[in-house]
């Protein structure tokens, strides 16, 4: 399967890319590198055992996202391109809203335009706040 991983050069995204590559999937990594480094890409490929395509870009650019999804014949999107620092989100709420909410909506709109129907969204355990017991209970 041809999979686009947004935020794919971040910590969780890069580990996901390695697993996808090891299982024979074709991986396209999209990242704006605001919280990651380009130097992780050769590591992803070495551990994954094959090459991945890297595109530096932003999920908020809907026209470019539609083009990427179409041009690379993407079949599924795994979305990790969210800002997650709790303290910073309080200091910069509009920036976080723009990236996390507006960006995700633009990504989904681009997916609809390109006919991509498979979507996995990753959140953060921080949405549960400080819990006294692990594992967290979601009910």
Swiss-Prot record:
Pfam families reported for this sequence: Epimerase
Binding-site residues for NAD(+), renumbered to this chain: 11-12, 31-36, 58-59, 80-84, 99, 124
Residue runs in coiled coils: none
Pathway assignment: Carbohydrate metabolism; galactose metabolism
One GO process term, biological-process aspect: galactose metabolic process
Keyword Transport: no
Reactions catalysed: UDP-alpha-D-glucose = UDP-alpha-D-galactose
Cofactor entry: NAD(+)
GO molecular function: UDP-glucose 4-epimerase activity
Enzyme Commission number: 5.1.3.2
Annotated GO CC locations: cytosol
Keyword terms, alphabetized: Carbohydrate metabolism, Galactose metabolism, Isomerase, NAD
Residues annotated as binding substrate: 124
Active-site positions on this chain: 136
Protein family membership: Belongs to the NAD(P)-dependent epimerase/dehydratase family.
Function: Involved in the metabolism of galactose. Catalyzes the conversion of UDP-galactose (UDP-Gal) to UDP-glucose (UDP-Glc) through a mechanism involving the transient reduction of NAD.
Assembly information from the UniProt record: Homodimer.
Protein name as it appears in the record: UDP-glucose 4-epimerase
Species of origin: Klebsiella pneumoniae
Gene from which the chain derives: galE
């Amino acid at each position: 399967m041809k999979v686009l991983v947004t935020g794919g050069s971040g910590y969780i995204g890069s580990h996901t890319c390695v697993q996808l590559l090891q299982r024979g999937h074709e991986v396209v990594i999209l990242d704006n590198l605001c919280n990651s480094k380009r130097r992780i890409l050769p590591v992803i490929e070495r551990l994954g055992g094959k090459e991945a395509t890297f595109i530096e870009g932003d999920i908020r650019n809907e026209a470019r996202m539609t083009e990427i999804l179409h041009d690379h014949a993407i079949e599924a999107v795994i979305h990790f391109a969210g800002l997650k620092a709790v303290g910073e989100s309080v200091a910069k709420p509009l920036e976080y809203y723009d990236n996390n909410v507006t960006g995700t909506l633009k990504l989904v709109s681009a997916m609809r335009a390109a006919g991509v129907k498979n979507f996995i969204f990753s959140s953060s355990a921080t949405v549960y706040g400080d819990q006294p017991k692990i594992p967290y209970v979601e009910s």
